[in-house]
């Protein structure tokens, strides 16, 4: 396994923060020379990164692109490496955020920062549908095989009809999810192309 891209990104992040520490050290040395008469300056303000939601897995490229709006991505052969995930200061979480709510399911694709964000809520719930896809395909294969209900009676036939409807409904949901993800990918590619052409003109 090639660890060079990961080491390179860590070194970049480490050296990116180094000039700030040098500046802080210089400020401390000048204060000690002056006798510490002046109050210590407040730490430099850092803009907070807008984070729409938090993904259950950083390997989910679409989720990370959706949730972390301003992260620069570097494509490597194995996976996508984010730059500077640990750099911004995090705000403290309240106790109510530390415990999962009834609506939040650990099987979801991500967890929204705001419960009022309907787009985010729908996106995170879509992950649940993708995970159900494998079980749906298994059920569909079992449905194709079918049980021999001639000996079991009306109850078996009714159960097969209900399962068939459920599987068709799940199949329709998964198809709509696939198309929405395909559209999201196309939009992301168009955005990247516009950004590249815009940068190339300047």
UniProtKB/Swiss-Prot annotation:
Alphabetical keyword list: Cleavage on pair of basic residues, Disulfide bond, Secreted, Signal, Vasoactive, Vasoconstrictor
Record-level Gene Ontology MF annotations: endothelin A receptor binding; endothelin B receptor binding; hormone activity
InterPro entries: Endothelin (IPR020475), Endothelin_toxin_CS (IPR019764), Endothln-like_toxin (IPR001928)
Signal peptide bounds: 1-25
Residue ranges of the region described as Endothelin-like: 110-124
Positions of the propeptide segment: 26-50, 74-202
Cellular component annotations (GO), alphabetically ordered: extracellular space
Annotated region described as Disordered, given as residue ranges: 28-49
Site feature Cleavage, where: 73-74
Predominant subcellular localization, coarse grouping: secreted
Role noted for this protein: Endothelins are endothelium-derived vasoconstrictor peptides. Probable ligand for G-protein coupled receptors EDNRA and EDNRB which activates PTK2B, BCAR1, BCAR3 and, GTPases RAP1 and RHOA cascade in glomerular mesangial cells. Also binds the DEAR/FBXW7-AS1 receptor. Promotes mesenteric arterial wall remodeling via activation of ROCK signaling and subsequent colocalization of NFATC3 with F-actin filaments. NFATC3 then translocates to the nucleus where it subsequently promotes the transcription of the smooth muscle hypertrophy and differentiation marker ACTA2.
Protein name: Endothelin-1
Organism expressing this protein natively: Atelerix albiventris
Taxonomic lineage of the native organism: Eukaryota, Metazoa, Chordata, Craniata, Vertebrata
